[in-house]
Amino acid sequence: MRRTLYRLMIELTNGRFTSYILRKFAQSRLSSIIIPSYAKVFQINQDEMEKGLKEYRTLHELFTRKLKEGKRSIDTDASSIVSPVDGVFADHGPIEETKTFDIKGKRYSIVDMLGNEERAQRYAGGTYMVIYLSPSHYHRIHSPLSGSVTERFVLGRKSYPVNAAGMEYGKEPLSKNYRSVTEVNSDGEHMALVKVGAMFVNSIELLHERDTVQKGEEMAYFTFGSTVVLLFEKDMIEVVQELKSGQELRLGEKIATRLAHK
């Protein structure tokens, strides 16, 4: 019953008009009025921001803020996979040969997430990792490894919450939400970086258009907090053992080791 009511309320409020109004407000000068309150409520680390709080003219500018030079370091070990974002480590685990994985008691289909069987097949038996970005986090997304970009594509139309309630009561938000996917071939092995849109503000802006990408290079940004899913081929990585669900991650921090490079 609780799940049914939750989904009904989300459907009633999560329309194109609502998203349009919220997006327009966030991009307007009027939104600057609530920037101080927003920064206080979400405890934004102002010492790391590229500009002072009063220099951001709109909420959108604050959402998509850059960091001061040198505030994040990228692990340079050739064998390392690094966190592509600042966020909370939600979960990781095996992708079944059926091209599915379980998180928070919910089964997700890689076929649904990536849009077709052919794309999903290369990740059967592989590993998934999920990182959640809250409204307080730095919202820019960087590459977790170096390689050649093989494909970029967008799927889904609407987005549902990806917070704790959304993950428990929502309808597979990680594979159903609006999402932007970048696939990278690194030394013959594939990784998919799935950028999952957040409810209401359904926007993911791509910044990287070249055919190659370097580890730590900026690729895109969310206009609000959301979630990143990483998919790796079978026998490609070993997740850092110390990583725990709920742990805070910083951009550039090592989260896994390339098995072929050990």
From Swiss-Prot:
Record-level GO BP terms: phosphatidylethanolamine biosynthetic process
Q: Name one GO cellular component term.
A: plasma membrane
Cofactor info, note text: Binds 1 pyruvoyl group covalently per subunit.
Q: In which pathway does it act?
A: Phospholipid metabolism; phosphatidylethanolamine biosynthesis; phosphatidylethanolamine from CDP-diacylglycerol: step 2/2
- Pfam name, any one: PS_Dcarbxylase
Which residues are annotated as site, described as Cleavage (non-hydrolytic)? 225-226
Report if keyword Lipid metabolism is assigned: yes
Q: Where in the cell is it found?
A: Cell membrane
PTM summary: Is synthesized initially as an inactive proenzyme. Formation of the active enzyme involves a self-maturation process in which the active site pyruvoyl group is generated from an internal serine residue via an autocatalytic post-translational modification. Two non-identical subunits are generated from the proenzyme in this reaction, and the pyruvate is formed at the N-terminus of the alpha chain, which is derived from the carboxyl end of the proenzyme.
Query: What Enzyme Commission number(s) appear in the record?
Result: 4.1.1.65
Residues with PTM Pyruvic acid (Ser):
226
Give the protein's function.
Catalyzes the formation of phosphatidylethanolamine (PtdEtn) from phosphatidylserine (PtdSer).
Q: Which family does it belong to?
A: Belongs to the phosphatidylserine decarboxylase family. PSD-B subfamily. Prokaryotic type I sub-subfamily.
Q: How does it assemble?
A: Heterodimer of a large membrane-associated beta subunit and a small pyruvoyl-containing alpha subunit.
Q: What is this protein called?
A: Phosphatidylserine decarboxylase proenzyme
* Source species: Bacillus cereus (strain ATCC 10987 / NRS 248)
Q: Supply the source organism's classification.
A: Bacteria, Bacillati, Bacillota, Bacilli, Bacillales
